[in-house]
Regions:
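Short coil/turn segments at secondary-structure junctions
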Residues: 33, 98-99, 188
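Hydrophobic, Leu/Ile/Phe/Ala-enriched alpha-helical segments that form helix-helix packing faces
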Residues: 49-53, 115-122, 204
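Short, well-ordered alpha-helical scaffold segments within catalytic/effector domains
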Residues: 46-47, 108, 112-114, 194-205
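ATP-dependent helicase/translocase motor core
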Residues: 124-207
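Short acidic (Asp/Glu) and glycine-rich catalytic loops that position anionic groups and cofactors
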Residues: 23-29, 91-93, 137, 180
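Mg2+/Mn2+-dependent nuclease catalytic core
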Residues: 64-156
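Metal-dependent nuclease catalytic cores that hydrolyze phosphodiester bonds in DNA/RNA
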Residues: 1-84, 109
């Protein structure tokens, strides 16, 4: 499971990307898209996209939300308040049409989760959710967007959270059962050790 899950006595906490990598997974989600940009090229590409936006554009917006015992947090790439558009920025190299379908699904999942968190934070009834792809070689930009209502995005968010919680709680239950099983197996050994200790304390009898 490629994510970090924090757990305390009251709730779980997970990053948006980890939530989406789990709940939006279809088939084998191999995150390698060859040829793909390096991490540094990705960072620089994000900066180039943000630099082209108009004044008032917001970037790296910290957002969080809650569903039952699951807290979800992360930073949205960008938001344009003039057109009410939440942007998820991705970099690529080469023909975008060759991108695997499950990669696109993961990107939409991230964008829609951030879209809901933004609607919740700003009390927005609707929002435009967009994927912005920058080709790091040609510097060309492709924008794909959907107009969504807050209710639609909330329903999407809750579905992802329900799937994740079911998995997390199942994992916890299996770990608890395994721990109980190991403890049960350890009891006879403890008793044998105790008997051995008792015998070692008895005085020797010479014949």
């Amino acid at each position: 499971m490629p994510c970090t899950l924090e757990r305390n006595a009251l709730s779980y906490s997970v990053a948006v990307r980890a939530l989406c990598e789990f709940s939006a997974k279809v088939g084998d989600l191999d995150l390698r898209f060859t040829p793909s940009p390096t991490a540094q090229e990705g960072i620089e590409g994000h900066r180039r996209v943000v630099a082209r936006r108009a004044a008032g554009y917001e970037s790296e917006i910290t957002l969080e939300g809650q569903f039952e015992t699951l807290k979800v947090r992360g930073r949205a790439d960008g938001y344009d308040p003039t057109c009410n558009r939440l942007e998820e920025i991705k970099t690529h190299r080469g023909d975008l049409s060759r991108q695997p379908a499950n990669h696109r699904q993961l990107h939409w999942a991230q964008a829609k989760v951030y879209g809901w968190l933004m609607c919740q934070a700003r009390q927005l009834p609707n929002i435009e959710v967009a994927l912005v792809y920058l080709d790091v070689d040609s510097d060309g930009q492709t924008l794909i967007s959907e107009h969504c209502t807050a209710d639609e995005l909330q329903a999407f968010f809750e579905t992802q959270c329900q799937r994740f919680l079911a998995w997390a709680q199942g994992q916890e239950q299996r770990l608890a059962e395994r721990k109980q099983g190991l403890q049960a197996l350890g009891l006879p050994r403890i008793r044998r050790s105790a008997r051995a200790s008792d015998n070692s304390q008895k005085p020797c009898t010479r014949r």
